[in-house]
């Protein structure tokens, strides 16, 4: 039976192979009211390990965060976007199965007045400030 990516990453973790630490540019650019939980930090580590490992990564890279409702998947997506921005990506597309979800997600990504706004007040990579726009 073929191993899933989760199986492979779990085996690496069990073998004591460390995953990358969540970079400061992710932590500093996410909304500071949302403290990262241990499993979110692990999700970032797994994401970074997979994305930056040419031997492990399939191309085109396609990932799914299989996490419970309310566990912070959208925050993980925001952090993933921040990382991908450092790799030169500038456009991101979301597919969801309902208008309600896309409207909430849009608000969380684009509206700084939203109680669930995902980013810090200022998003910066070094001296470069970045604006999120639709």
State what each model feature region is:
Residues 1-134:
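RecA-like P-loop NTPase motor core of helicase/translocase proteins
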